[in-house]
Structure formats: structure tokens, C-alpha cells
């Protein structure tokens, strides 16, 4: 009887270990796309409060930026309540302004800003991206240095 309880406990422990190992594999798989290229993606929320210095605005935005192996960049952000004049991905930690890395393309609806085809990060820019030191900035006539900002957090 005692041996049977020990045997069942050992089997239960092995099954639990196998389930945890498989769950870990599923999490790792989410970092790969269907062509087995590594993908880092950032969902981004744009607000005036993130600007440096912060601005008061009713405008907002959100989007998703993806960086694949080879450092190619894709994605877009959609804004509301703003007539944007330009939008970029900039280098800079939260609370700091930085240089333009990639200029975004404005759609015909005037509210969607997309990463242009073929855009890539340099190795140094990719390192900054992985550290959370890139951000999206949407400029307007009222706020030439930026009205909406959102930090990219891979």
C-alpha cells in the first residue's frame, strides 16, 4: 500500500513537470512568427502626458510596432482628436527627448501613421529598442515638438 502511494506520487510529480515544461515551450513559441523569425512587438498607447514636457490634449492614439529578426520594422498607430503634421519613431528613454529614427507615413484618412516598407533599425537602435528606449511621437501645428507620445516596450 505504501509503495503504491509513493509510486502514484512520483508519477504525479513527473506529469506535473512535463506539463510545466510544455507550457514553457508554448511561451517561447510566441516569440516566433509562422516563418520562424524572431519577433518583438510593442503595443503602444499615445498620450500628451508622455510628452517631454507633458502637454494637455484631448487627443490620443494607439498601435502596434513589430521588429523582426534582421531588425526590420513594421506596424502603425492610429490617432484621434489631432491633426498630426508628422510622426516618427525616436530614440530616447522615458522622460527624455531624442533623435528621429524612422519617419512614419501618414495615411489618406489622416489618422493612421505607418512604418514605411523596408524600414530597419541599426544594431545600436535595436539595442535601444530592446531596452525600451524608443518611442513614437506625433507632432501637430499646436505642439510642434510633439502632442502625443508613447514609449515602445518590447
Summary of predicted features, one role per range:
Residues 11-20:
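Hydrophobic helical h-region of N-terminal Sec-dependent signal peptides
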